[in-house]
Amino acid sequence: MEQNSEITVSKTNIKIADAFGYSNAEVQVISSTVAKGTTPMELSYFLNVCKSVDLNPFIKEIWCYKDNRDNLLIFAGRDGFLAKAQKSTSFNGIRSSEVCTNDEFSMDIANNKITHTFGIKERGAIVGAYAIVFRKDGEPTIEYADFKFYNKGYNAWKSHPAEMIKKVAETHALKK
């Protein structure tokens, strides 16, 4: 069975491509993946946001979709926030870890202090994750994400639960 890899390009896509510096094929890929279901006007708006915040939809730093009321929702992911942070001269790194039931863990937000240790014994179930964003010109930002609150049982959460909850904590810390 042969797959058809042709890309259909409309005059609207050509105009959008010209306006935002993408090729016609790239606009088609964006409109059928990370901006699926958007109208030409919504796609133009989305690409303008991508350009203005300097985030790349091809590596899922930013994407959009339509909700059940047909509203356009635009999201920046953890990789988008990390890309923006890495361009900042004050960014000095990020550290994160999942927290499990058998870990020794304490968090003192007022004093920007986390103590987290675990050994080689069974760590137990994941209960959350934390992230610390370090800045050269200020205090670190610490965020904690509760696993039960964020885990909705989607496939990625089933196969990579530690990575998913760390991404949530990192996103919250990077946003600040």
Where are these regions (language model features)?
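Binding-interface segments
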Residues: 2-176
